[in-house]
Curated annotation (Swiss-Prot):
SMART domains: KOW (SM00739). PANTHER family: MITOCHONDRIAL RIBOSOMAL PROTEIN L24 (PTHR12903). Keywords: Ribonucleoprotein, Ribosomal protein, RNA-binding, rRNA-binding. GO terms for molecular function: rRNA binding; structural constituent of ribosome. GO terms for biological process: translation. This is Large ribosomal subunit protein uL24. Belongs to the universal ribosomal protein uL24 family. HAMAP family: Ribosomal_uL24_B. It comes from the Bacteria. One of two assembly initiator proteins, it binds directly to the 5'-end of the 23S rRNA, where it nucleates assembly of the 50S subunit. One of the proteins that surrounds the polypeptide exit tunnel on the outside of the subunit.
Length: 104
């Protein structure tokens, strides 16, 4: 099945501590999760590794979130939207369900 949300899509977070925020998808994982730039930050205790030049300490990094907790953002309506698929000129394209415009 084709992915409804892909890398570089702008999404709205629907659930969790960052609910209502908009961000860009930086990575889509095969487990049904994705990473949104700057959101779902967790603190990781990093052990120093002098061989790699990595300093130790507490760092913040983006953690994956379930794809069902985000919705694609429709620029035309300014709201979260659903995505459908259709064929145009022999190619499968994504479109917004609310106004039938193509995604990107």
């Amino acid at each position: 099945m084709a992915a409804k949300i892909r890398r570089e899509d702008e999404v709205i977070i629907l659930a969790g501590k960052d609910k209502g925020s908009r961000g860009k998808v930086s990575q889509v994982l095969p487990t049904g999760k994705l990473i949104v730039e700057g959101f779902n930050l967790v603190k990781k205790h990093q052990k120093p590794n002098p061989q790699l030049g990595v300093a130790g300490g507490v760092i913040e990094k983006e953690a994956p979130m379930q794809a069902s907790n985000v919705a694609i953002f429709n620029q035309a309506t300014g709201k979260a939207d659903r995505v459908g698929f259709r064929f145009e000129d022999g190619k499968k394209v994504r479109f917004f369900k609310s106004n039938s415009e193509l995604v990107k």
